């Protein structure tokens, strides 16, 4: 859907850089840009508001992809656009929540022994949802930050829990 918009006249797709190489049904955004799609990188969704103000003749399509951490910024961006009366911004959403994704994995992928949970999402949702998953699926869920020492500590914690056949939620 993003590529379809990016190929339309007077439409530009805005996306974060990590989405450029993700394969889609017709190729990646990077591939499609080489075939004429109008795709621009953004560092913040609020850039869409600035661009839409400066170029009202263009429809700015924001690829709103992410989890609990990114959804609020898209909502605030749209609120700002509405308050300013900007009508040339569209969202293509693929926003998910972590817990249903983990639940699906637990129900469909039985060969996973434990989970490293995202610290940035956990700041928003807390640790209780992971505690419930640990009890329900009898697997350890450990929250980690992005630093190497956090990840190593979490791996150590997971290995210890798996060895002892424990299933708890921990934070590194």
PLM features: residue spans?
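Membrane-embedded hairpin module used as a gating/binding unit in multi-pass transport
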Residues: 120-132, 148-161
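Short glycine/threonine-rich loop/turn motifs
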Residues: 95-96, 119-122, 139-151
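Conserved small/polar residues in nucleotide/adenosyl-binding loops
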Residues: 169-171
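Short, ordered loop/turn segments at secondary-structure junctions
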Residues: 18-20, 44, 67, 96-97, ...
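Short, surface-exposed amphipathic charged segments that create phosphate/polyanion-binding patches used
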Residues: 53-60, 104-109, 131-132, 155-161
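Phosphate/pyrophosphate-binding betaalpha-module
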Residues: 63, 67-129
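Metallocofactor- and cofactor-centric catalytic cores in central/energy metabolism, strongly enriched
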Residues: 1-57, 71, 81-84, 92, ...
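Short glycine-rich or small-residue beta-strand-to-loop segments that form or flank ligand, phosphate
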Residues: 12-17, 59-65, 115-117, 144
């Amino acid at each position: 859907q993003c590529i379809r918009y990016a190929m339309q006249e007077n439409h530009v797709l805005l996306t974060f850089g990590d989405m450029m190489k993700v394969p889609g049904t017709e190729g990646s955004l990077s591939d499609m840009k080489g075939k004429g799609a109008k795709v621009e990188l953004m560092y913040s969704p609020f850039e869409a508001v600035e661009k839409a103000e400066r170029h009202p003749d263009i429809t700015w399509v924001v690829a709103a992809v992410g989890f609990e951490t990114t959804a609020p910024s898209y909502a605030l961006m749209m609120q700002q656009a509405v308050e300013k009366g900007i009508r040339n911004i569209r969202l293509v959403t693929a926003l998910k929540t972590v817990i249903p994704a983990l639940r699906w994995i637990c129900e469909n992928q039985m060969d996973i022994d434990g989970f490293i949970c995202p610290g940035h999402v956990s700041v928003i949702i807390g640790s209780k949802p992971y505690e419930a998953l640990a009890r329900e699926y009898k697997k350890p869920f450990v929250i980690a930050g992005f630093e190497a020492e956090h990840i190593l500590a979490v791996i150590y914690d997971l290995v210890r829990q798996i060895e002892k056949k424990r299933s708890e939620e921990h934070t590194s």
